[in-house]
A protein has these predicted regions:
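Alpha-helical transmembrane segments in eukaryotic/viral proteins
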Residues: 28-65
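Hydrophobic/aromatic-rich, well-ordered segments within soluble, folded domains that form packed cores
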Residues: 82-104, 242-262, 457-460, 658, ...
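Active-site-surrounding "flap" and adjacent substrate/cofactor-binding loops of secreted or lumenal enzymes
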Residues: 67, 71-72, 88-91, 96-168
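Asp/Glu-centered strand-loop micro-motifs enriched in Gly/Pro and often flanked by an aromatic residue
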Residues: 20-24, 77-84, 106-108, 188
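Noncatalytic, helix-rich "gating/capping" subdomain that lines the substrate-entry/channel surface
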Residues: 127-443, 480-483, 492-519
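Helix-loop boundary elements of multi-pass alpha-helical membrane proteins
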Residues: 3-42, 252
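Short, Gly/Pro- and small/polar-rich lid/capping loops
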Residues: 55, 59-81
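Intrinsically disordered, low-complexity linker/terminal regions across diverse proteins
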Residues: 51-53, 121, 278, 284, ...
């Protein structure tokens, strides 16, 4: 563009030219020089004006391209503070996005980790406490269920009353109902009245599954009804691997038992011997305990039988058939011989039954009552809780205790979540989130169907059924509708028995018996495929359940369920950095969008693929398609099994995490393609974030995705995650999917073979 001079400048130049003739010849060189200098400075000044105008115009254009809403400013801030731009994104995208966040974040003393989810959960925790501590509203009538939730909370935080009540109630149950705890009585304990069957039955009424687990679940072969389930229960340290070698954790576990026994009794004559025997017995049981990997890796190892045929199947001295009948009869449910029973971990049941047959009455009584007391310590005075907290510090790697009000808020929310949610959604939830989330789910579902349509490894019949299943997925967003209305009849009915007093220990004992009865009584109910389910909106997670083919988005949650075929997104997850109604869509699709895709993909992972669109576990893929799927799945398993966990030098377990890894990879691809389509239909609608304008919208999609997985954890917690969690660590949830995605390579101009770009991409969906 040519320089444009003002009229004043042009006039001055003309006057200089007219005066040249009247000057003497001797002064002409100086005049010419002066004129040239003047022209130079004038031109420079004009050029400065021009450049200034251009700069202002350019700045105005930049400003028009920026999103400067409060949310965008906040989002820009958290992302800028997270990025480490000294790291090459094509070499290590996780540390490129999370490097500064990791450096500057500090794990709270009372926590074993910090990440995006824990930050949201912390906010939820305080919101719940606020709801439970605020006085009832004078303007509107609040449900009685919420009043009872507040009573339960107040009994939990009333430390003085807990101290005054002491341990009399718990010890009365132990001594008068359960037959005593031998470790407290030394050699005076009388074993003549010991009855394993009666002991386990009494504890099951307190919602304790010890050694053997029983309960109710959706029938995998007929998703319209419930059936009975039998299998292994849990073990004290959670996973078999902890018992393999002596460690600071096994030492701390024995100290937990020993210190509790000594605090409860002055008779310490046999404490050390009993503690060692209890641990040795549990260690023996643990040898037969199925790990998370083994349970997920043997989906067809379950056996379907009936109550009448159960004894013939198990052939153990422990009468499981009578045990089931007695437990359900306590809740008012009479079992028939024809009632279906799904048996899990059959080898465990047989092997542990044989161990029990060779174990003394004293040891069985000691172990079983210990497992009851292990949980009831939480409801006892502070000096007893401190014993468990000392163990937790070693097991989790923490250095201080969670505040009492947060513990109590979580306890009430975990047991009366829908009552808490009734007020939570009115106070904290934006209904626009439901509308926008529903639209995104539709777009991402369509994206997944398109991916199925283009999959070359599926035969036509399997592909058609897969698309039908994807289109049939039911979705739950935010909260059930009845919580938002004025009619609280359904809520009041749900919590009709939840009436409490000022006695915390008695409230807890009543509550766990209610929960036990509810699980048994649901057996005779019909499965409501459209119902919200059992998870309240006040959680931070999302869910997919195969036997309902349903997805749910709540305000606070991100899990997966193998019971119902639906996906759930509770209210708690629909906020920054996952979602905001004012956010550019590349942030929402990179956040909650990937979560949506993740949950949809669960319907087609190694477990979900075995359920049809109606939620029944039946073969609906051809053998050829199953073989093709397994080859692609193996690629994912091998890839993730080669990841090494920093600091603890452990390999990730790709077999254990395969379902979640498949969902992570598919979810990222689905959401990205859905965002691409949205962006094509809405050109230039997404503005850039201040301070991050050098990144394209597609790059920002991946950056926000990775940011949701920034995490930091103690070594103890990292080991626990590797041993037991079906989810990969955050670092691998970023590196794995992005390194398999050619669109990531294109967006960041990566070359296959670089650190964050695999040459051989592992692609299932």
């Amino acid at each position: 563009m040519k320089a444009q001079f003002s009229q004043g400048t042009l006039k001055r130049l003309s006057m200089m030219r007219e005066s040249e003739g009247s000057q003497s010849r001797s002064k002409r060189p100086f005049i010419v020089l002066g004129t040239l200098v003047g022209i130079f400075f004038a031109s420079t000044a004009v050029l400065a004006v021009i450049l200034g105008l251009k700069s202002k115009a350019a700045q105005k254009n930049v400003d028009n391209e920026l999103c400067v809403t409060p949310y965008c400013v906040k989002a820009a801030n958290y992302l800028i503070e997270s990025l480490d731009e000294t790291v090459e994104p094509c070499e290590d995208f996780y540390h490129f996005v999370c490097g500064a966040w990791i450096k500057n974040s500090r794990i709270p003393d009372d926590a074993d980790s910090i990440n995006t989810f824990s930050t949201l959960r912390t906010q939820l925790d305080y919101n719940v406490v606020d709801i439970l501590t605020q006085p009832p509203s004078n303007d509107t009538a609040e449900p009685t269920a919420l009043d009872n939730a507040r009573i339960l909370y107040n009994s939990c935080v009333n430390e003085q009353n807990i101290e005054d009540e002491g341990t009399d109630t718990i010890l009365s149950i132990v001594n008068n109902e359960l037959g005593g705890w031998p470790i407290l009585e030394g050699s005076s304990w009388d074993n003549s009245t010991f009855n394993l069957f009666d002991l386990l039955l009494k504890l099951r009424k307190y919602n304790n599954d010890i050694i053997f687990g029983i309960g109710t679940s959706v029938d995998e072969k007929n998703s319209q009804q419930y059936d009975l389930v039998i299998g292994q229960s849990d073990i004290g340290l959670g996973q078999r691997q902890y018992y393999s070698n002596e460690s600071k954790i096994t030492v701390a576990y024995r100290e937990f038992i020993r210190d509790l026994a000594k605090e409860l009794s002055d008779n310490t004559s046999m404490v050390d011997t009993d503690v060692n025997d209890i641990f040795a017995f549990e260690k023996e049981i643990a040898k037969h305990y199925w790990t998370t990997e083994e349970r997920r890796g043997r989906p067809n190892a379950t056996i379907r039988t009936t109550v009448g045929s159960l004894t013939d199947l198990l052939k153990t001295s422990f009468d499981f058939s009578t045990y089931l009948r007695s437990a359900y009869a306590w809740s008012g449910v009479t079992l028939d011989d024809s009632d279906v029973v799904t048996v899990h971990e059959l080898e465990y049941l047989n092997n542990v039954s044989s161990i029990i047959d060779q174990t003394s009455a004293r040891l069985l009584q000691n172990y079983i009552v210990w497992r009851f007391m292990m949980h009831r310590v939480d409801n006892m005075p502070k000096r007893f809780r401190s014993i468990k907290e000392n163990f937790q510090h070693i097991f989790r790697g923490t250095t201080s205790d969670v505040s009492r009000k947060i513990i109590c808020g979580n306890f009430v929310n975990g047991n009366m979540g829908f009552a808490v949610s009734a007020l939570y959604i009115k106070k904290y939830f934006d209904d626009n989130a439901r509308i926008q989330s529903s639209e995104m789910i539709g777009n991402i579902r369509k994206s997944f169907s398109d991916m199925i349509e283009k999959s070359s490894w599926m035969d036509e019949a399997s592909r058609k059924k897969a698309i039908e299943k994807a289109e049939a997925i039911d979705e739950k967003i935010g909260y059930p509708d009845y919580l938002a209305g004025d009619n609280m009849t359904q809520l009041e009915t749900q919590y009709a028995d939840y009436k409490f007093t000022s006695s915390y220990i008695n409230n807890v004992l009543k509550l766990i018996q209610i929960k036990a009865k509810e699980e048994f009584q649901i057996l005779r109910k019909t499965v409501d495929r459209k119902a919200w389910g059992f998870t309240a909106p006040t959680v931070v997670n999302a869910f997919y359940a195969p036997s309902k083919n349903q997805i749910s988005i709540f305000w606070f949650s991100y899990l997966s369920s193998s019971i119902f075929l639906f996906i759930a997104f509770p209210a708690g997850i629909l906020q920054m950095p996952f979602f905001d109604r004012d956010a550019p869509k590349y942030l929402n699709y990179g956040g909650i969008g990937v979560v949506v895709g993740h949950e949809i993909t669960h319907g087609f992972d190694n477990s979900g693929r075995q359920f049809d669109k109606d939620g029944n576990r039946i073969p609906w893929w051809t053998k050829e398609t199953v073989q093709e799927f397994n080859e692609r799945k193996t690629c994912i398993v091998d890839q993730y099994s080669n990841f090494t966990v920093p600091n603890i030098n452990m390999k990730a377990n790709g077999n254990q995490t395969q379902g979640e890894d498949i969902a992570d990879n598919g979810g990222l691809r689905e959401s990205f393609f859905a965002y691409q389509k949205w962006a094509q239909a809405n050109p230039n609608a997404d503005k850039k974030l201040p301070g991050l304008s050098k990144y394209t919208p597609e790059q920002m999609f991946f950056i926000n995705y990775a940011h949701t997985w920034c995490s930091k954890m103690t070594d103890s917690y990292a080991m626990n995650r590797v041993l037991s969690d079906v989810h990969s660590l955050g670092q691998f949830r970023v590196i794995g999917p992005t390194s398999n995605f050619v669109e990531f390579d294109r967006v960041f101009k990566c070359q296959p073979g670089q650190g964050n770009s695999r040459v051989k991409k592992c692609i299932v969906w």
